[in-house]
């Protein structure tokens, strides 16, 4: 991806995530990419980094093949959805939404 992701200014840039595309649907910015690692590792990193950047965690859920972390901060809210890539437990699909609160 050539341009920086459309995320809040203080939103953490997860070291293990490669961002591949972004789009806007109405008021919602969507950023996608992948994490080199399993869903649990991705979930733990995302949650810890968001909390460390002073974002509020509204909800989080970790299951065997997917995870969600809903957040708010800096006048925005959204969700980081993590899904195991089909047939590859060492690569996790990342889907981040963010919109005005």
List where the protein language model places each region.
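An acidic-aromatic pocket/loop used at catalytic or ligand-binding sites
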Residues: 1-101
């Amino acid at each position: 991806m050539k341009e920086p992701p459309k995320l809040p200014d203080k939103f953490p840039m997860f070291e293990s995530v490669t961002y591949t595309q972004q789009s806007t649907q109405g008021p919602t910015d969507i950023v996608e990419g992948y994490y080199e690692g399993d869903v649990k590792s991705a979930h733990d990193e995302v949650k810890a980094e968001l909390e460390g950047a002073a974002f509020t965690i509204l909800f989080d859920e970790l299951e065997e093949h997917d995870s969600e972390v809903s957040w708010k901060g800096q006048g925005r809210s959204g969700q980081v959805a993590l899904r195991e890539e089909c047939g590859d437990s060492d690569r996790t699909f990342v889907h981040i939404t963010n919109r005005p609160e």
